[in-house]
Curated annotation (Swiss-Prot):
PANTHER family: LEUCINE--TRNA LIGASE, MITOCHONDRIAL (PTHR43740:SF2), LEUCYL-TRNA SYNTHETASE (PTHR43740). It is an enzyme of class 6 (ligase). It holds the Pfam family Anticodon_1. It comes from the Bacteria. It comes from Mannheimia succiniciproducens (strain KCTC 0769BP / MBEL55E). GO terms for cellular component: cytosol. CDD domains: Anticodon_Ia_Leu_BEm (cd07958), LeuRS_core (cd00812). ATP binds at K622. One of its GO terms (molecular function) is aminoacyl-tRNA deacylase activity. InterPro entries: aa-tRNA-synth_I_CS, aa-tRNA-synth_Ia, Leu-tRNA-ligase, Leu_tRNA-synth_edit, M/V/L/I-tRNA-synth_anticd-bd, Methionyl/Leucyl_tRNA_Synth, Rossmann-like_a/b/a_fold, tRNAsynth_Ia_anticodon-bd. A motif ('KMSKS' region) lies at residues 619-623. It catalyses: tRNA(Leu) + L-leucine + ATP = L-leucyl-tRNA(Leu) + AMP + diphosphate. This is Leucine--tRNA ligase. Its EC number is 6.1.1.4. The gene is leuS.
């Protein structure tokens, strides 16, 4: 064994062993319990960042722990390789997106290998490879045949100068990122998948996921947004036309004072034909893209159409307004406005002087002031004809019944969830496998024509997609007839919605999945990724699994049993202000700090002498230049040290503050472990400790070892509190470094302890533990060594500490044999000098004994 811990040499050797022996290759074995652990795969942006390292380290700890517990572990890796950043990088670097992507994959793959993750590299996937997206294209055509795919017009960002569609990220303050032309909203035909057909399943399925974070489930419930209400039909005055609205508050129906419709609603467009001012307002609304999240805070604007609807029950006219807060693609594109009982309606009515009629009163009879705000709570009805006095539920049902009997309303369950628009007018994505025939018919591409391959050797001009710019690419045939390929590509969430399933049979060429493999490995046992994916990826991922199930490809209802959402990685951010008043952000690696005795920053300067402002701990980002390069850290400290710090510095779900002093501490800890094994190995023993021959000090140390094993096993396996597991190992290590190695039983206890520590740390710091396991004389390889088990007998305390109180105050502590009787414990306590002092001259009137913990004397 080498005397010095040299991670730079050791880690390369261990990684070479793993690679040469395919140690982590996963093979289906029905005789073994499987465990599928998966991290959300990375976008190949060029370099790993610390957020990646944290995510993948957590997954690797879980994988290695489960492997030591005898499970057949699958931990695959791949690349979410399509996406807009590749197009921008290709234009900037005068290269093709494919070339940029594949170079990044090669680079990042080496970075992952440096960190020692136990991946089955034979299952590696890159979603931009035709052999992957072929099956995605095929599945889309199958969904089309089942009626789950359709095409309709939808709004996009349109640059009229470049005549191209822009992604949201390419719109800067309402203008095109390239030419600064004001962006318009344009309707174009796009493909959709009917996720709404699965809304109820997606909602109810959340109740079958007890090991998902409650926050993620709540976010999905809110996103799906199930509501029970009534769809009501209003007639238009002096017309045969009608307009439908949906409301969850039919109890407020008598308080409707106006109707608001979206700019794209047929009523609005009809009214605009003879009203130039209204036409201009409608165009302004259409050119302002509004995210649903902004509706609550944006300025409410509207204009009267001059059209009235007729209230179905009262027969009174209801003026129709065009309003910028009503979206055409949500609900019916029209809402009934009850300003007395909806705050948004109230603000609009107040602004434009529209009537505010109270129809709900508080149940307790209190007066409300409708000049200040709407009363939005449930209550009892007033000013509502025969429904006066009813509470919410009775009024809901009473008014719904009346509307249904009149033939102008129907009870309805609605969802906030909208169908998934999967068309993207970008180049770097999987081509959508639909063909347009000369007669205008649209048909799915047949399997024998798949994959429709995206050309990779292209020149990007930053304006048009190469497959849209090249008319020859789209030309094809269908049953001998000329046809045109679709030039839109799939939303990249398509690829990430089923990759986890393809990992079970990545080289399978006969179909999308080998169902035998898929049904052995699925569902995923542990999935790990950021909570920012809660309502997009994690919802599409669940939806796709149900589609795969209904196609007979998988047999389970949900894709993963357990979900862990790791916290962000933060780092100090520093800047100085340039002569032009611009903030120049400086990398923390170039900052010199002066701190006070409590570690607080007093002064920060960079290597050019600028005095810096400390902007605090913020998420690592390019914009603040505070990212820490994992590769630099691995080269400086070793992969095990980086992994140990990542797992120790914070609970997995919480934010982690990057502190290089903490990384240095992790390196010192591993050095101490190495030194301890080195010292022990000068005179090791082969025999296990003999419990009957141990001194009380040796028993106490052994008891600490086995209590630590029990705690660490629970912390890693059940609680997933990896930081507390490491803290317990560090506490044990402090005791081991102080323990003597004088006689054989000392060394036997130490040998058992070191064997346990090395196995407990192995999932976290596998390289050093791989070597130390061999150095401790083990002939097997630690990768498949069994997880260390706690010895129940060793954990039993021979002695117990009893706190002694007199009149409620602690006056002594006594250590007594664990089996000592209560009367004997009293006798020992009363012999204590300090206890005698506080009982002197008093009579004991009561004795309270809590077995093994507390003896309390009440004296007068």
């Amino acid at each position: 064994m080498q005397e010095q811990y040299r991670p730079d040499l050791l880690e390369q050797e261990v990684q070479k062993y793993w690679q040469n022996n395919q140690t982590f290759k996963a093979v289906k074995d029905s005789s073994k319990e499987k465990y599928y652990c998966l991290s959300m795969f990375p976008y190949p942006s060029g370099r790993l960042h610390m957020g990646h390292v944290r995510n993948y380290t957590i997954a690797d700890v879980v994988s290695r722990y489960q492997r030591m517990n005898g499970k057949n572990v699958l931990q695959p890796v791949g690349w979410d390789a399509f996406g807009l950043p590749a197009e921008g990088a290709a234009v900037k670097n005068k290269t093709a997106p494919a070339k940029w992507t594949y170079e990044n994959i090669d680079y990042m793959k080496n970075q992952l290998k440096m960190l020692g993750f136990s991946y089955d590299w034979d299952r590696e996937i890159a979603t931009c490879k035709p052999e992957y997206y072929k099956w995605e294209q095929w599945f889309f055509t199958e969904l089309y045949k089942k009626g789950l795919v359709y095409k309709k017009t939808s709004v996009v960002n349109w640059c009229p100068n470049d005549e191209t569609v822009l992604a949201n990220e390419q719109v800067h303050e309402g203008c095109c990122w390239r030419c600064d032309t004001p962006v318009e909203q344009k309707e174009i035909p796009q493909w959709f998948i009917k996720i709404t057909d699965y809304a109820e399943q997606l909602l109810s399925g959340l109740d079958t996921l007890p090991e998902w974070p409650d926050m993620v489930k709540t976010m999905q419930r809110n996103w799906i947004g199930r509501s029970e209400g009534v769809e009501i039909t209003f007639k238009i005055e002096n017309s045969d036309e009608t307009v439908a609205v949906y409301t969850t508050r039919p109890d407020t129906f008598y308080g409707v004072s106006y109707m608001a419709v979206a700019a794209g609603h047929p009523l609005a467009e009809k009214a605009a034909q003879n009203n130039a001012e209204l036409a201009r307002f409608i165009q302004e609304c259409k050119n302002t893209k509004v995210a649903e999240a902004e509706l609550a805070t944006m300025e409410k604007k509207g204009m009267a159409t001059g059209i009235n609807a007729i209230h179905p029950i009262t027969g009174k006219p209801v003026p129709v307004w065009v309003a910028n807060f009503v979206l055409m693609h949500y609900g019916t594109g029209a809402v009934m406005a009850v300003p007395a009982h909806d705050q948004r309606d109230f603000e609009f009515a107040t602004k434009y002087g529209l009537p505010i009629k109270q129809v709900i009163a508080p149940m307790n009879g209190e007066e409300i002031d409708l000049t200040k705000a709407a009363f939005t709570e449930h209550g009892k009805l007033v000013n509502s004809a025969e429904f006066d006095g009813l509470d919410f539920e009775a009024a809901f049902n009473g008014i719904a019944d009346k509307l249904e009997k009149m033939g102008v309303g129907k009870r309805q369950v609605n969802y906030r969830l909208r169908d998934w628009g999967v068309s993207r007018q970008r180049y770097w994505g999987a081509p959508i496998p639909m063909l347009t025939l000369e007669n205008g018919d649209v048909v799915p591409a047949p399997l024998q024509d798949l994959p429709i391959v995206l050309p990779e050797d292209v020149v990007m001009d930053g304006v048009k997609s190469p497959i849209k710019a090249d008319p020859d690419w789209a030309k094809t045939s269908y049953n001998g007839q000329p046809a045109l390929k679709e030039t839109d590509t799939f939303d990249t969430f398509m690829e990430s919605s089923w990759y986890y399933a393809r990992y079970t049979s990545p080289q399978y060429h006969e179909g999308m999945l080998d169902s035998d493999e898929a049904n052995y490995w699925l569902p995923v046992d542990q999935y790990i990724g950021g909570i920012e994916h809660a309502t997009m990826h994690l919802l599409y991922f669940r939806f796709f699994h149900k589609l795969l199930r209904d196609a007979g490809l998988v047999s389970t209802d949900e894709p993963t049993k357990k979900l862990l959402c790791q916290g962000m990685v933060l780092a100090d951010a520093f800047y100085y202000t340039s002569p032009t008043n611009e903030r120049i952000w400086v990398s923390p690696t170039k900052v010199m700090l002066e701190r006070d005795e409590k570690g607080r920053i007093l002064k920060a300067t960079d290597d050019e002498g600028h005095e810096l402002v400390h902007a605090g701990m913020t998420k690592m980002s390019k914009s603040k230049n505070n990212g820490i390069d994992p590769q630099e850290m691995v080269e400086k400290y070793g992969a095990d040290t980086v992994r140990l710090f990542m797992m120790f510095a914070s609970p997995a779900e919480m934010t982690l503050e990057w502190q290089e002093s903490g990384v240095e501490g992790a390196k010192r800890f591993l050095g101490r472990l190495w030194n301890l094994v080195f010292e022990y190995n000068k005179n090791p023993v082969k025999t296990a400790p003999n419990p009957t021959a141990l001194s009380s000090a040796q028993k106490a140390l052994r008891r600490d070892v086995h209590k630590t094993i029990a705690k660490v096993s629970d912390d890693i396996g059940r609680r997933q509190t990896f930081n507390t597991a490491i803290a317990a190992i560090m506490e044990l290590m402090n005791k081991l470094t102080r323990a003597p190695l004088t006689d054989e039983q000392d060394r036997a206890v130490m040998g058992e302890a070191l064997s346990a520590v090395v196995r407990m740390l192995y999932p976290i710091t596998p390289h050093i533990c791989f070597q130390l396991w061999k150095d401790l004389g083990n002939e097997d390889i630690i990768d498949f060594a069994p997880w260390v088990q706690a010895d129940e007998a060793a954990m039993i305390d021979d002695e117990k500490l009893v706190v002694v109180q007199v009149n409620g105050k602690v006056r002594g502590k006594i250590t007594v044999p664990a089996d000592m009787a209560e009367e004997e414990i009293k006798r020992v306590a009363l012999a204590e000098e300090n206890v005698q002092k506080f009982l002197d001259g008093l009579n004991i009137v009561k004795v309270i004994y809590v077995p093994g913990k507390l003896l309390s004397f009440v004296a007068k």
